[in-house]
Every structure is written in structure tokens, then in C-alpha cells.
């Protein structure tokens, strides 16, 4: 085709005509060009013969300044008329293809390189996608639309160009060095076959990652669920249990399948992309995506399960949009059945949502159908997304994982581990969450309202506000097989039973949930709003002068750069003053001028709302804040003392906030933080002792502000232990203690003017009590009453003296004592008068 000037002229004319309509872009171009050796000859390989694909590749190479595929290239003494070839050879004049034959260009290259050991050639697989969609229907009309696994001819390609040509994506993959294959010394023919096999596997895996694996259409998929052994048995059990015919039970199972299954279509995905592109540009100043390269790599050859944090109803829309824009298949998304409503539910279903009931209890047939549907998605390699937190976090904290979906995933993998599963944590960080106003009531302590898609319409009136930027950070993937190998060695050889529910399933699932939550927190995107909230909420009056505020923010940034929380955590750009201006522009920060300068403060509404953004990053500052707390009541501490008290308190902070470090790693991390404190002037180190600055110094003020960020958490811990100790051994249940703690916290928040609803959040007390039980600090007797270790009081008071001011400890003890006396009066017998 390119052997003569005439053919080059024809090709150039075709390319220009094609681009009167077609618009193309390259996926992940930067990571590809980094791996390219410009000093070595480059050959492009396309999977199937296509002049239009070649024209698109040639255009993208020209745009990127890469060698063009249609120009001659030399390898030693070999001169090839063009720098491309097709993995599947051109058809003969009857239209027949010999798919087993080797491309002549590849054969000549291997021969030339075998004769010249100094030469090499880079083979770059290139894929052109005319739209992205899984082949979810077999109707002739839909086969005309997007790239799929079906084999179709020139008519379909023509219509694909007409319909989807303006959404064409090109994927350049990492170069394959032919020299490395030749050095295996397999001989000419075996080397050619090896290269062909590598390329075939590569194209198959890439296609699955970009357009999704091959699945049957929805009706056949749902009907197929009913023919699986576990579902067939569940149908028979349902018929016997409900005293109905097997046909009626099967019809019910079919209704469940139709209620659950998604109806994934390219049309809906493309519609959502257009709408969401407008929406993001309308309300956000930008969307930053970090570390997606690792996902693009792991998506090939793995069943990917995205596990994002859940802060807003738009989380799943944002993630699907970004995956689609970055050349990855949007996942099938687990959605609550409350979202399956007219119009909205249909659109979500076509966008990949499958619906699940909030509880499966008492409905084994539904459970079986749902589990089988997920198992089908997993084993076919279709990406899936679900939220391990269950509902949206109204407080900004990472919620305790709901392990139901994780357990279903684990059981599916135990049933068939042929397709390796990898969990991809996704942290979504908002500078202003869209539902912020609707969260205000709950942040002030009102009861949680039932979730509804209509929540999103309540924010329409707030769209005139500035919402800043959104950061989407992809965390470190968790490979399920490796996790099971570490948690349950030999799991592959174990007898798992017909239901695939080994005795260790619940405990292992809980640990998997904790690991996912920790990896999510590791990927946190720290933004200016988080840091401003952290600083101002640590002050007594929620105010600082602008210079002091800038110093605090600069300190936080310096500490985080000195001791990075994790490689996946991201920091904002700019210094403290730039961060202040950014938050002021978003109307989250108020300003007052006087003769001495500017005062920055939070008004009443923003003060409550900013607790949400502070809580987003509390896990990152918990350990340094704890270390700073030690020096509020003492001027000097040895390293041994610091390590001792930190190790005593850390397990409870780690459990509540999902902090990443293990106890074995803790000492080294503490040393890093202490070194950073000394470097920033927050501490001095003299004669093996750490000394705090003078109380009147600027550095002591900074140290105190840092310590305040964790103060309320430590107060809750001390409050719980004080109530328990005052109640005595075996006299109160966990539920009663939880209720007492909640009431006491509400009272203390009024007495001390605390404006933080999570201070009296019952679930936090419940989790702390459970952690005490898990660590054997507490035990339950047969009646459910709690007993505690005899050293608990001494340890609690010793640690409390180090981290809590005397007036706070006294106030907590007084309220706890009065509460115990009131309880004693209620159970004491009445006094008999003669």
C-alpha cells in the first residue's frame, strides 16, 4: 500500500477525508512515550487489517511526534517499506484469511535480527477503539455501533465510523523488544510463534480491559442463573419451604434476577458521559486523577473490583466517567434498591447499576440468585464496583466496613479462583461535597434520613456556590489470592463444603474490610479545605489572625512532606497563604479587619460543616497529634516514655481511624515524627530527652494546636473507661455502657461548648467498646455484663494524665461519678420509716 508514491497519495487523501468527521485521542500517551527508546527502530502492529485504523494510528503518531507507520524504516541491512504490520494477515482475493500464518514483516525482522546481534527492533501493539462498549446485545442493529467481541465486516465498520467516529480512542502499549525474544535461542520459527502468541494474548487482555469481556445479552444471562446448581437447589428448597410448585419458585427466582441484573448499554454510557462532562465543568474547577496507571496495568488479566469511599451520590458517576475517559471499562455498580425508581432506575441500570436489597435475611432464594449473578460477573472478568462503607459518610470519617459484599466476593473466589480478583481502592476527595447542606442537620446531631436519589435534587439551588476541585486517587491494589495466602495458608487445599463457607470466613472477611479501609485512607487527597478546617477547629474561638494561620498551614505541609503518610497520599500545591486565599474564594472562611490586621474565622454554619472536611484527614494527623498531646501536661519526656504511652493508646486510634501502621512498624514511624518535630522547632532533643518549647513561644502554640485535633477522640476514650470503672465489675452491659457514654458526651458537649456531633456518636462508642473486648481488656460474663482487667484504671489514668488537661479529666470524672450515684439511687431500696 505504501510502496509507491501513488499509494501514499491515495492514503493521504483517505486520511484527510476520514478526519473531516473522525476525532481521535490517545489513551495514556505519557506513560507509553516514557518507555519508548527513540534510538531503536519502531514497528507498529495492529490486530486486524483495517485501512481506517491505520489512518487513525498514523494521525495520532503525527500529533505525538512519533515515527509514522506508513514511512520506510531500516533495521541493519533490511529496509522495510512501512513501519507497521497486521497480526492477522491480509485476506486473499477471495476474502479468506490464514490466521495461523505469520506476518511477513515479523518473519523478516526476526531473520534480520538473528543475523545481526547489535540490532534491535521495538514492536508496539496498537489498538483503535471506535467507541467503548461491551457486546451486551446480539441484535443486528446494536452490532453496528461500537467495538465488541463479535466479528463483523466492512458495513459495520462504516457505520461505526459514522456513529462513533467522533469518539475514537487509540491505545499504544509498551514496546516489545524483539532482541529479548531472540536471545531465548529458540530458533527462527519458534521465535516468530512466540512473538505472535505474546501479541495475541496482549490484544485479548487489552480488549477485555477497555471494552469489557464478552457477555451474553441480559435475558440469556438472567435465565442462565436459574440453571446453576446452587440456584436450582435454592428453587427446590423454596418450593418445599413455601409449599408451592417448583415452577412458581422458578418464576420467582426469574423475577429476582430481572430485579437485580443491569442492562449495560453503550448508548447510556455515552449519554452519561456527555451530560457529566457538562456537569463537572459547570460546578468544579477541575478533576485531578492520580495513580490511575497502576489500574490500567492491573486491569489486564484480572477481575477488577473498585471499592471507593462513599461521600456523595455522585461518587459512582464520577468514577465511571473517569474510567471511561481513561480507556477502562466502566464497572457494574451495586446500588440500593431504593434507587430503582421510574426513569432514574432505568438510566442507572443501563449505565451499569445492578440493584440489591438492603437485607437478604429471611429470603434464601433471593440470596442465591444475587450471589450467582455476582459470581457470573466475577468469573467472566467484568469489572464491579461497590462501597464497603454501605451508605454515605455524613461525618467525613471512614465508616466501619459493611462486609456483606466482601463475603459474597470471597465465597465466589473460593468457588472458582480461575480469574484472579484484585480490589482497587479509590479515594474521592471533595473540597466541597455536593450534599453539604443536606448533611448539616445530621452534623448538628439530627437523626440520619433515609437515602434517596432525590437528595441530589436538593442541591440544585446550591449550584451557584464554588465547589472547588475534586481529587480522585487510586490506591494500592489488593490481590485477593495474595491476601488469602497470608491470612489462610493452604486455603486452596481445604474442603470448603457445598456453600463455600469455611469456619474462618467471617474473621477473614472482617480483616479484608479493615485492609480495604486502610488502603482507602492511604490514598487520601489532602486539600486546602481539609487543612484550614483542621487548624481553625483546633482553636478555642474558631479564629486565627491571617499570619498565624499561614504559619500553621505551612507547618502542616512541612510535616506531611517530611513524613509522608503513604506513597498514594497527595498534598495541595502552594504555601499557607495560597491555601487561605483558595478557601476564602469558596466562601468557607470569613474575614474581619481591625487595627492589628486580619482575623480569619468560621461562622456558625461553616463551623459545623468544616468538621466534615477535618474528619476526612484526621487519620493522617492522629499520630503526630497524639505525640504533641504528651507535651501539653509535661515539659519533658524520654523516648521510652513516648513509645510506651503511644503503644498503649495507638491500637484504639488505629481501629477507629483505620491508620495504616502496624505495632511492629510504630516505633520507627514515631522516631520519624519526633525528628520532624525537632526539625520544625516543636521539640528540642537534649541528653536523651525531648523538651517542649517555652509555653509563651510561638512554637508551643503550634504544638498545642496540633494536639487539639485529636483531643475529642481521647476524651471519648477516657469517658468510656471512667464510666466503666465507676460502674464496677460485672455490673453493666456493653449496650448500657454505650447508652451512658452517649448521654454523658452530650452533656459534656453542652458544658464545654463542643460543636462536633461525632463526639457523642453512639457508633464510635460501640466500636471502642468492641475494640476493648477484642483486645481482651474487657470480657463478657454469661449475663452479658462487662468485667475489666485489674490494671485498666491505673493504665487509663496514667495515659490520661499525659494527654488530657487536668480540668477535662476532672470534669469527666465528676459527670461519671454523678451518673453512677444516680444509677445507685435508682436501684437502692426505699428507706422504711417507723
UniProtKB/Swiss-Prot annotation:
Its main location: membrane. Signal peptide: none annotated. One of its GO terms (molecular function) is glycerol-3-phosphate O-acyltransferase activity. It is found in: Cell inner membrane. A motif (HXXXXD motif) lies at residues 309-314. Its EC number is 2.3.1.15. It is a peripheral membrane protein. One of its GO terms (biological process) is fatty acid metabolic process. Keywords: Acyltransferase, Cell inner membrane, Cell membrane, Lipid biosynthesis, Lipid metabolism, Membrane, Phospholipid biosynthesis, Phospholipid metabolism, Transferase. GO terms for cellular component: plasma membrane. InterPro entries: GPAT/DHAPAT, GPAT/DHAPAT_C, GPAT/DHAPAT_LPLAT, GPAT_PlsB, Plipid/glycerol_acylTrfase. The HXXXXD motif is essential for acyltransferase activity and may constitute the binding site for the phosphate moiety of the glycerol-3-phosphate. This is Glycerol-3-phosphate acyltransferase. It comes from Pseudomonas fluorescens (strain Pf0-1).
Amino acid at each position: 500500500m505504501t510502496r509507491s508514491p501513488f499509494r501514499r497519495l491515495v492514503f493521504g487523501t483517505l486520511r484527510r477525508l476520514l478526519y473531516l468527521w473522525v476525532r481521535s485521542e490517545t489513551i495514556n500517551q505519557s506513560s507509553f512515550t516514557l518507555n519508548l527508546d527513540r534510538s531503536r527502530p519502531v514497528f507498529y502492529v495492529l490486530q486486524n487489517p483495517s485501512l481506517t485504523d491505520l489512518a487513525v494510528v498514523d494521525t495520532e503518531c503525527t500529533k505525538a511526534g512519533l515515527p509514522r507507520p506508513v514511512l520506510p524504516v531500516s533495521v541493519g541491512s533490511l529496509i522495510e517499506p512501512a513501519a507497521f504490520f497486521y497480526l492477522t494477515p491480509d485476506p486473499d482475493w477471495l476474502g479468506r484469511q490464514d490466521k495461523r500464518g505469520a506476518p511477513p514483516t515479523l518473519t523478516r525482522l526476526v531473520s534480520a535480527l538473528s543475523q545481526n546481534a547489535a540490532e534491535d527492533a521495538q514492536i508496539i501493539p496498537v489498538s483503535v477503539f471506535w467507541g467503548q462498549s461491551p457486546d451486551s446485545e446480539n441484535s443486528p442493529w446494536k452490532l453496528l455501533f461500537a467495538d465488541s467481541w463479535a466479528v463483523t465486516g466492512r458495513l459495520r465498520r462504516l457505520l461505526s465510523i459514522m456513529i462513533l467516529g467522533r469518539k475514537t480512542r487509540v491505545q499504544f502499549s509498551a514496546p516489545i523488544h524483539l532482541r529479548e525474544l531472540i536471545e531465548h535461542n529458540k530458533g527462527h520459527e519458534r521465535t516468530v510463534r512466540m512473538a505472535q502468541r505474546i501479541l495475541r494474548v496482549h490484544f485479548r487482555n487489552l480488549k477485555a480491559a477497555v471494552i469489557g469481556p464478552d457477555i451474553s445479552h441480559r435475558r440469556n444471562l438472567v435465565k442462565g442463573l436459574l440453571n446453576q446448581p446452587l440456584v436450582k437447589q435454592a428453587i427446590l428448597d423454596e418450593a418445599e419451604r413455601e409449599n408451592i410448585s417448583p415452577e412458581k419458585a422458578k418464576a420467582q427466582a426469574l423475577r429476582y434476577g430481572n430485579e437485580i441484573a443491569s442492562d449495560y448499554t453503550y448508548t447510556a454510557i455515552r449519554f452519561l458521559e456527555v451530560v457529566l462532562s457538562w456537569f463537572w465543568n459547570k460546578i468544579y474547577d477541575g478533576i485531578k486523577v492520580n495513580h490511575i496507571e497502576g489500574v490500567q496495568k492491573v486491569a489486564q488479566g484480572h477481575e477488577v473490583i473498585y471499592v471507593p469511599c462513599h461521600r456523595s451520590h455522585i461518587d459512582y458517576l464520577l468514577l465511571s466517567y473517569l474510567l471511561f475517559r481513561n480507556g477502562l471499562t466502566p464497572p457494574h455498580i451495586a446500588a440500593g434498591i431504593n434507587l430503582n425508581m421510574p426513569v432514574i432506575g432505568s438510566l442507572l441500570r443501563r449505565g451499569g447499576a445492578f440493584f440489591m436489597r438492603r437485607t437478604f435475611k429471611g429470603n434464601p432464594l433471593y440470596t442465591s440468585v444475587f450471589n450467582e449473578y455476582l459470581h457470573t460477573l466475577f468469573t467472566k472478568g467484568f469489572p464491579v464496583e461497590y462501597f464497603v462503607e454501605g451508605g454515605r459518610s455524613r461525618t467525613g470519617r471512614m465508616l466501619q466496613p459493611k462486609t456483606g459484599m466482601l463475603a459474597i466476593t470471597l465465597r465466589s473466589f473460593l468457588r472458582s479462583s480461575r480469574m484472579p480478583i484484585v480490589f482497587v481502592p479509590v479515594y474521592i476527595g471533595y473540597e466541597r461535597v455536593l450534599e453539604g447542606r443536606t448533611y448539616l442537620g445530621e452534623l448538628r446531631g439530627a437523626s440520619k434520613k433515609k437515602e434517596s436519589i432525590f437528595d441530589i435534587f436538593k442541591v440544585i439551588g446550591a449550584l451557584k456556590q464554588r465547589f472547588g476541585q475534586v481529587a480522585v486517587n487510586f490506591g494500592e491494589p489488593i490481590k485477593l489470592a495474595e491476601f488469602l495466602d497470608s491470612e489462610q495458608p493452604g486455603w486452596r487445599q481445604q474442603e470448603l463444603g457445598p456453600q463455600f463457607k469455611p469456619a474462618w470466613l467471617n474473621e477473614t472477611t472482617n480483616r479484608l474490610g479493615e485492609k480495604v479501609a486502610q488502603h482507602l485512607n492511604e490514598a487520601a487527597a489532602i486539600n486546602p479545605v481539609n487543612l484550614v478546617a483542621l487548624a481553625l477547629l483546633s482553636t478555642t474561638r474558631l479564629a486565627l489572625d491571617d499570619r498565624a494561620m499561614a504559619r500553621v498551614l505551612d507547618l502542616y505541609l512541612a510535616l506531611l512532606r517530611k513524613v509522608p503518610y503513604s506513597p498514594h497520599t497527595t498534598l495541595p500545591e502552594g504555601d499557607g497563604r495560597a491555601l487561605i486565599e483558595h478557601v476564602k474564594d469558596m466562601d468557607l472562611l470569613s474575614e474581619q479587619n481591625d487595627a492589628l490586621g486580619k482575623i480569619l474565622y468560621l461562622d456558625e454554619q461553616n463551623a459545623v460543616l468544616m468538621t466534615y472536611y477535618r474528619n476526612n484527614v484526621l487519620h493522617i494527623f492522629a499520630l503526630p497529634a497524639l505525640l504533641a498531646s504528651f507535651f501539653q501536661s509535661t515539659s519533658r519526656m524520654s523516648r521510652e516514655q513516648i513509645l510506651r504511652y503511644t503503644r498503649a493508646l495507638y491500637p484504639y486510634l488505629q481501629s477507629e481511624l483505620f491508620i495504616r501502621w502496624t505495632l511492629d512498624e510504630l516505633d520507627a514511624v514515631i522516631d520519624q515524627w519526633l525528628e520532624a518535630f525537632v526539625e520544625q522547632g516543636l521539640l528540642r532533643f537534649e541528653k536523651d530527652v525531648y523538651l517542649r518549647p517555652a509555653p509563651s513561644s510561638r512554637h508551643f502554640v503550634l504544638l498545642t494546636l496540633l494536639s487539639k485535633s485529636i483531643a475529642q477522640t481521647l476524651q471519648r476514650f477516657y469517658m468510656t473507661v471512667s464510666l466503666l470503672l465507676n460502674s464496677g465489675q460485672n455490673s453493666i452491659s456493653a449496650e448500657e455502657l454505650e447508652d451512658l457514654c452517649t448521654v454523658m458526651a452530650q452533656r459534656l458537649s453542652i458544658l464545654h461548648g463542643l460543636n462536633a456531633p461525632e463526639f457523642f456518636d453512639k457508633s464510635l462508642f460501640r466500636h471502642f467498646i468492641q475494640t476493648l473486648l477484642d483486645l481482651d481488656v474487657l470480657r463478657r460474663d454469661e449475663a452479658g455484663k462487662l468485667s475489666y482487667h485489674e490494671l485498666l484504671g491505673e493504665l487509663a489514668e496514667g495515659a490520661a494524665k499525659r494527654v488530657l488537661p487536668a480540668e477535662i479529666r476532672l470534669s469527666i470524672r465528676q459527670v461519671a461519678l454523678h451518673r453512677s450515684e444516680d444509677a445507685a439511687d435508682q436501684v437502692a431500696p426505699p428507706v422504711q420509716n417507723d
